[in-house]
């Protein structure tokens, strides 16, 4: 007060009020504030005190009304609309209109919806009248409230709050006050009384939203006039004072407004009062209405009448609540009434009566039926007892009784049906009990919980429970790795053995059937060149074909299977040989396996200067699995460092003994570049062919294998097919794997179109519906209908297998949960892979599986042959994937779309580089780790005391010392101190670093216990890129 400023909480403390009461008054007076710690000026404090004392603040209110005259006029209109009848009683009170408008401004701003309903019901004068009474009441109440300051402010403050929330709250109060003095003065007619009640009711209904506890204070201290204003508020809150009359008035408005509307002819006001009333009863509930009648006795006659009106609507509310439990009773009475109706109906119609009697008999029979178990009888008796006890209260809903009675017979009949089902169930159980739990199961790879349960003859829930106790939350469709399966199987006493995977080179289908025996003819051999990368396979085939295919291969390595036809002259006859050139890179294992499976003779190419390498051993295993004869071509014999004998020696270790050493393997030293011994190699191939007696039936429908497939931008799906039996012609309907197609054109290895392809003939086929998988077998069908059926069934099988593979990718192992808990969420690298041919896609996917994926998992969202399209870009943008292209191109618009979406598109033509970049990207997702990098070693040779500390005179023995680097001080074998090198000087000058062989002074802020001979190790922490852990 001395400084001219007072904080709101200080004023409330001085007046012994709550902060919220003072804030409500500030809202009413439009005094700006942020919180209860805001300050008020002296003028504002005077205004607040006047309001709390019960007097209308004349100066501030007048100023507000003058400043905001347009707004006040608007509110006057709204208020007048509210009350039509009361205004007639108090038409001449326009003097104080300005003041109420100022206080009502906030109210009108907040609830715009409440204001409109008041307008229609009121006239121009009533608007002013309601506003006037609000202030006169306060002035009249001043003397009463002045003595007890604390309660009075509460009463006034709370009304202020109510206007802030809903606009109607402020207007109703003045209306009640204005009308109260008028009826007391002279009006004795019953109509005016009704008008008073209706007016009071709108006040309370509008004030219903106002704070409840604040109004309780008003009734206690103020006279009868005040309690009426505060009554609506008290009704909302829990009122302890003995003035329930106020709440009663609040409840009464619903019934009275209706009467007032009918009597006065103003339906609008009544309709608006009704919507406001339902809001109040919902909040306080029924109990509040009960409490109000008790204090109603001391109230005046008018109040008693109001209370009586209020209580009439209340009882229906109480009855509605208990009706819910009374529902069960209704069916009881309804059942009895139904029996009476049925008896009457039986007398009139004999047929109907007989039918109903039968039904009743059935019900009785069911009750007495021996099939009912003791538990069912008890349950039925309990249900009847409950129905009896609950049936007494009400009888309105008769139809519900029928379903209740009908349920009883159904329960009785169920046992009979269940008996038949029980028999069926028993039979099923007997059948299911036949399979015995195996003692040993064999596994090839991971499998789902459902598959494991079927294999072990164990309920799926038991397996899931077992996994749960191991800390693995698995579902029925989740895939388990072999280690987890072994542990689960051990719990059930079942041994697990892993099957050796069958080689992909094994020939699973016999192309020549018994029916072809009569039409067999000799066919050209299919020769596959296999061996390690860069050992000269393609160069050797070029030498045989006298072409230069290797020069066109990216990186000089073969990345597809190439099929070539070569005409060779032997003993004066022309012989045809089909060569398949397989990739030697480790990623192309599947291609080499396919090449071995379709081949008749395998040529193992080994470099004389390199010897046996990993892919050489793999090629040997493929040839043995395919059970095909093997010819070894020792290439690069023209080099100085060539050692053919050493190569022969290495091959003997793997069961390939040369003929000259007494074995059965043909070995020919050749030089692909110089063309040495090429004729000898071809002669050996033809000799082996004669021994093998290769035959086929060219007169039947073609069968064979898909060597390679890709999607051509112009020609669509293109597949390289090797016909192994029969003849393939243009127009034939064929199924390759799950792909249906009709041969539209065939092109040989030289680019010439052909009309028919005989056995051992490799051609490119156009006209397939989709790109088949490399390695799939194809067969020609006579009609398209049967071919389509086969293709559809295979497509369904492939879809199911893909789903299982997708589930397997979310592999669950015993270490998964703990690893994810330690590392956080498992990081993933999303890829979209597009390659030129299907074989390349397989090779890349196989190589990606070999990458360590403990910390970062590779998710291939799409892997398909063909060019990179805008659809691929959209998928990558939505999933945050990187598009990897291998020997492919971008479709028109794909590059622009990728630039706009910010998608990373990488194109490769060498698989080495592709795999290296993907591994680098996986490592880039890992958080870098801090690694200690040693800088040097420093020896302390002297100690100088400076003030309270000491400086070490040192000599840099090795490396260097850098200011602010990390150091360790060692004394003998003990670590004395670890910290940071704070000060580094040379010749009394600060330096950043001192190199080896120089002296320097070192000072530390937190260490000074130097001794001569101490060794200081200098190092720094650097971030190092983490590598993938195997």
UniProtKB/Swiss-Prot annotation:
Gene3D superfamilies cross-referenced by the UniProt entry: 1.10.10.2480, P-loop containing nucleotide triphosphate hydrolases, Translation factors, Translation initiation factor IF- 2, domain 3
Localization: Cytoplasm
Region of interest (G4), residue spans: 635-638
CDD domains listed in its UniProt record: IF2_eIF5B, IF2_mtIF2_II, mtIF2_IVc
UniProt region (G3), positions on chain: 581-584
Positions that bind GTP: 531-538, 581-585, 635-638
Compositional bias ranges of the Basic and acidic residues kind: 134-144, 188-206
Top-level taxon of the source organism: Bacteria
Coiled-coil portions: none
Region G1, residue ranges: 531-538
Annotated region described as G2, given as residue ranges: 556-560
Region ranges (Disordered): 56-361, 394-434
Keyword annotations: Cytoplasm, GTP-binding, Initiation factor, Nucleotide-binding, Protein biosynthesis
GO annotation, cellular component aspect: cytosol
Positions of region (G5): 671-673
PANTHER family the record matches: TR-TYPE G DOMAIN-CONTAINING PROTEIN (PTHR43381:SF5), TRANSLATION INITIATION FACTOR IF-2-RELATED (PTHR43381)
Family in the record: Belongs to the TRAFAC class translation factor GTPase superfamily. Classic translation factor GTPase family. IF-2 subfamily.
NCBIfam families tied to this protein: IF-2, small_GTP
Protein name per Swiss-Prot or TrEMBL: Translation initiation factor IF-2
Organism, scientific name: Synechococcus sp. (strain ATCC 27144 / PCC 6301 / SAUG 1402/1)
Lineage, opening ranks: Bacteria, Bacillati, Cyanobacteriota, Cyanophyceae, Synechococcales
Name of the gene encoding the protein in the UniProt record: infB
């Amino acid at each position: 007060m001395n400084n001219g400023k007072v904080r709101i909480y200080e004023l409330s403390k001085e007046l012994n009020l709550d902060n919220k009461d003072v804030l409500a008054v500030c809202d009413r007076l439009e005094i700006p504030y942020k919180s209860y710690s805001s300050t008020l000026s002296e003028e504002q404090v005077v205004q607040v005190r006047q309001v709390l004392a019960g007097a209308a603040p004349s100066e501030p209110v007048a100023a507000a009304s003058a400043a905001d005259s347009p707004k006040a006029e608007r509110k006057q209109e709204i208020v007048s609309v509210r009350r039509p009848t009361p205004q007639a009683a108090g038409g001449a009170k326009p003097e104080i209109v300005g003041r109420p408008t100022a206080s009502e401004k906030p109210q009108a701003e907040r609830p715009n919806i409440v204001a409109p309903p008041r307008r229609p019901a009121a006239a121009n004068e009533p608007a002013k009248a309601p506003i006037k009474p609000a202030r006169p009441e306060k002035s009249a109440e001043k003397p009463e409230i002045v003595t007890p300051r604390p309660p009075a402010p509460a009463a006034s403050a709370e009304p202020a709050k109510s206007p802030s929330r809903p606009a109607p709250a402020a207007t109703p109060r003045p209306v009640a006050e204005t009308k109260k003095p008028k009826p007391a003065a002279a009006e004795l007619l019953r109509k005016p009384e009704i008008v008073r009640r209706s007016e009071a009711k709108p006040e309370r209904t509008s004030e219903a939203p106002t704070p409840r506890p604040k109004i309780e204070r008003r009734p206690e201290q103020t006279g009868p006039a005040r309690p009426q204003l505060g009554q609506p508020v008290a009704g909302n809150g829990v009122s302890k004072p003995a003035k329930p009359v106020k709440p009663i008035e609040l409840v009464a408005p619903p019934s009275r407004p209706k009467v007032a509307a009918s009597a006065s002819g103003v339906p609008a006001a009544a309709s608006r009062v009704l919507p406001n009333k339902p809001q109040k009863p919902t909040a306080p509930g029924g109990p509040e209405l009960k409490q109000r009648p008790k204090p109603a006795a001391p109230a005046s006659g008018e109040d008693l009448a109001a209370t009586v009106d209020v209580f009439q609507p209340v009882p229906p509310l109480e009855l509605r609540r208990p009706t819910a439990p009374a529902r069960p009773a209704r069916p009881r009475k309804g059942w009895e009434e139904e029996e009476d109706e049925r008896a009457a109906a039986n007398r009139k119609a004999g047929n109907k009566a007989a039918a109903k009697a039968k039904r009743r008999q059935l019900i009785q029979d069911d009750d007495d039926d021996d099939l009912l178990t003791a538990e069912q009888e008890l349950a039925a008796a309990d249900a009847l007892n409950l129905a009896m006890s609950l049936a007494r209260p009400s009888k309105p809903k008769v139809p519900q009784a029928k379903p209740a009675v009908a349920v009883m017979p159904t329960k009785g009949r169920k046992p009979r049906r269940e008996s038949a089902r029980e028999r069926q169930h028993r039979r099923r159980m007997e059948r299911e009990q036949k399979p015995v739990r195996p003692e040993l199961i064999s596994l090839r790879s991971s499998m789902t919980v459902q598959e494991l349960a079927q294999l072990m003859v164990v309920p799926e829930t038991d397996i899931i429970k077992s996994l749960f106790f191991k800390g693995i939350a698995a579902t029925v469709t989740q895939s388990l790795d072999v280690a987890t399966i072994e542990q689960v199987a051990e719990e059930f006493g079942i041994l697990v053995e892993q099957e050796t995977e069958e080689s992909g080179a094994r020939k699973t289908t016999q192309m020549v059937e018994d029916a072809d025996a009569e039409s067999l003819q000799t066919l050209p051999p299919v020769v596959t060149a296999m061996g390690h990368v860069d050992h000269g396979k393609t160069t050797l085939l070029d030498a045989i074909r006298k072409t230069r295919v290797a020069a066109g291969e990216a990186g000089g390595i073969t990345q597809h299977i190439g099929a070539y036809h070569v005409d060779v002259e032997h003993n004066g006859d022309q012989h045809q040989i089909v060569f398949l050139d397989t990739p030697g890179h480790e990623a192309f294992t599947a291609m080499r396996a396919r090449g071995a499976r379709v081949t008749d003779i395998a040529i193992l190419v080994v470099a004389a200067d390199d010897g046996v390498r990993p892919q050489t051993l793999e090629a040997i295993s493929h040839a043995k699995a395919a059970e095909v004869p093997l010819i070894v071509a020792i290439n690069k014999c023209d080099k100085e460092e060539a050692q053919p004998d050493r190569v022969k020696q290495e091959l003997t270790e793997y069961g390939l003994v040369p003929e000259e050493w007494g074995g059965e393997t043909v070995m020919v030293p050749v030089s692909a570049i110089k063309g040495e011994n090429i004729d000898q190699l071809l002669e050996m191939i033809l000799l082996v062919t004669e021994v093998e007696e290769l035959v086929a039936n060219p007169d039947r429908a073609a069968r064979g294998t898909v060597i390679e497939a890709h999607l051509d931008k112009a020609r669509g799906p293109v597949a390289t097919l090797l016909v192994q039996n029969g003849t393939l012609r243009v127009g034939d309907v064929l199924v390759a794997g799950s792909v249906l197609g009709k041969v539209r054109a065939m092109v040989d290895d030289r680019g010439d179109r052909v009309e028919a392809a005989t056995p051992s003939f490799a051609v490119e086929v156009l006209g397939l519906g989709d790109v088949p998988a490399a390695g799939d077998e194809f067969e020609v069908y006579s009609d398209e209908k049967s071919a389509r059926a086969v293709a559809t069934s295979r497509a369904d099988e492939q879809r199911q297998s893909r789903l299982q593979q997708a589930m397997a990718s979310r592999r669950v192992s015993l270490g998964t949960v703990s690893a994810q808990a330690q590392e956080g969420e498992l990081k993933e690298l999303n890829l979209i892979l597009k390659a030129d041919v299907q074989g390349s896609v397989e090779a890349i996917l196989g190589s990606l599986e070999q990458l360590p994926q403990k910390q970062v998992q590779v998710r291939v969202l799409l892997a398909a042959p063909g060019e990179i399209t805008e659809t691929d870009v959209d998928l990558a943008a939505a999933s945050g994937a990187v598009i990897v292209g291998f020997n492919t191109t971008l479709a028109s618009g794909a590059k622009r779309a990728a630039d706009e979406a910010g998608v990373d598109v990488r194109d490769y033509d060498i698989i080495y580089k592709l795999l290296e970049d993907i591994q680098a990207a996986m490592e880039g997702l890992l958080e870098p780790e801090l690694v200690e990098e040693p800088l040097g070693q420093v020896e302390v040779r002297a100690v100088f005391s400076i003030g309270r500390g000491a400086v070490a005179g040192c000599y840099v023995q090795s490396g260097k010392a850098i200011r602010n680097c990390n150091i360790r001080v060692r004394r003998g074998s003990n670590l004395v101190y670890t910290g940071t090198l704070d000060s580094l000087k040379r010749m009394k000058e600060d330096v950043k670093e001192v190199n080896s062989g120089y002296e320097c002074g070192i000072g530390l802020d937190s260490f000074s216990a130097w001794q001569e001979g101490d060794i200081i190790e200098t190092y720094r922490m650097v971030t190092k890129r983490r590598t993938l852990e195997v």
